[in-house]
């Protein structure tokens, strides 16, 4: 019988959310260097791939380790156009061909990430505004080299005004963690302290996100990712959308409990690797 694979949590401590390291230590072997990885290990490379993902995944492969998501999954999650196309009508329409935009908007613009701290750096009312904003974003050193994408603006149910003047306001949006085809945790995307309590109380609970909607989204992207997040939101007309897909090795916890996320990941890893 082959020995069970050792799950290794390769991490950068300063980049982890509160409580994350203690939660990971309950289930995984902790490591801060790729030199600690042994042949046969299953590696959860948390916040470790940037800025040279190909180098990291190549090195770990040469060490004889298997990396959750791998380079293919890492690249897929970073490619908004790829996963948007796979999701189809489950996600807002997205394009990098600004000449094809209808004049009437509005649109949301983003590179690999959106500047949610400055709504004026995300929102464009018309196609002309989108073209001008793209030029500004391309000149921004923080987005230089990113593919700037325009997305159909979806007005989500509000959870209150922006806690910071000029920032993106909180809305009914949830971060759903998925590990190997199973939802292991779901919670508010926005910090609850930034939201109005009455609106949070009136909003759907995470377990009220339609199961069929989540299953459809997971079927679209789950062949490319093993451990990932779906940010899903409810619009003002009552329709659910996938707003974002993120690599679970990079996504923040939002309001999810790391203990729940990593217990779920450990359970699913044990299932797929045969570890008892």
Task: Describe every region a protein language model picked out.
Residues 161-166, 172-189, 241-246:
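Beta-strand scaffold of nucleotide-dependent catalytic cores
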């Amino acid at each position: 019988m082959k020995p069970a694979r050792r799950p290794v949590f390769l991490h950068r401590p300063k980049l982890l959310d509160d409580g994350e390291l203690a939660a990971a230590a309950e289930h995984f072997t902790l490591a801060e260097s790729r030199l600690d990885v042994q042949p046969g290990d299953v590696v959860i490379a948390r916040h470790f791939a940037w800025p040279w993902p190909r180098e990291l995944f190549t090195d770990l492969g040469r060490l004889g380790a298997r990396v959750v998501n791998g380079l293919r999954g890492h690249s897929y999650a970073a490619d908004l156009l790829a996963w948007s196309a796979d999701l189809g009508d489950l996600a807002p329409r997205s394009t990098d061909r600004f000449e094809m935009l209808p004049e009437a908007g509005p649109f949301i613009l983003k590179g690999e990430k959106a500047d949610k701290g400055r709504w004026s750096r995300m929102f464009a009312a018309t196609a002309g505004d989108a073209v001008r904003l793209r030029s500004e974003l391309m000149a921004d050193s923080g987005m230089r080299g990113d593919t700037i994408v325009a997305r159909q603006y979806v007005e989500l149910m509000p959870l209150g005004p922006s806690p910071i003047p000029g920032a993106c306001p909180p809305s009914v949006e949830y971060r759903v963690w998925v590990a190997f085809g199973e939802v292991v945790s779901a919670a508010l995307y926005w910090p609850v302290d930034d939201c109005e309590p009455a609106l949070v109380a009136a909003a759907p609970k995470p377990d009220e996100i339609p199961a069929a909607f989540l299953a459809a989204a997971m079927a679209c992207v789950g062949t490319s990712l093993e451990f990932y997040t779906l940010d899903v939101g409810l619009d003002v007309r009552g329709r659910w959308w996938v707003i974002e897909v993120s690599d679970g090795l990079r996504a923040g916890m939002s309001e999810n409990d790391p203990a729940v996320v990593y217990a779920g990941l450990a359970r699913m890893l044990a299932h797929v690797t045969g570890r008892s």
